[in-house]
Amino acid sequence: TANEVFTNSVTEIFAAKNANVDYYKVQNDLTTASLIDNTYIDQKDGSVVSVHTFSFGGKLTRNNLNFYQNGERIDSTMKGVTIIEEKQHVDHHTLVHHIQPNCESHQDYKGIYGENATGVFNGKIIVDKIAQKTNAFQQNNNILVSDKATINTKPQLEIFADDVKCSHGCTIGQLDEEALFYLQSRGIPKKEARALLMYAFAN
């Protein structure tokens, strides 16, 4: 329709030796807007890069986030919070490629999905054979606040080195009914109690 909007964006970040970069993305579009966001990050020795993605709106959002560790003593951090409802769809695809030894990466994505919302998390960590002493962490936690909401999560590890520390995991659940009851028993209305629990989870 005439009100539909489609955006295809590309961001490239080149972190030189010992550089420190913090990059924040806030996605809060109209329900008629679709976005494909492509972010590519190339890191050199000793660089530290953090990307924080907040996805709150839009009809369809696809985030492609790719880190390439082209050096040693590199630290890469990806954090994301998704809060959507209605028929919104947010799709996170992450890749961290550990190419050199003695590097770290941290991924922590959280999602809260309401009525008819759909979420996807597809995260991959690749550790090359030469990338010994790698420390890589990946976690995706989700709450479905409606029985019509869905989440598809797929954390992945491809490890070709033998001296590494790598972990990944995911959780899918609902709001804690006992915690909700406790807050209501202290005089907090149900709507506000639910909001407090979701805030605590996302925080």
What are these regions (language model features)?
Residues T1-F181, S185-I188, A202:
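Conserved beta-strand/loop scaffold segments within soluble protein domains that form the structured core
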Residues L197-N203:
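Short, surface-exposed loop/turn segments at secondary-structure boundaries that line and modulate
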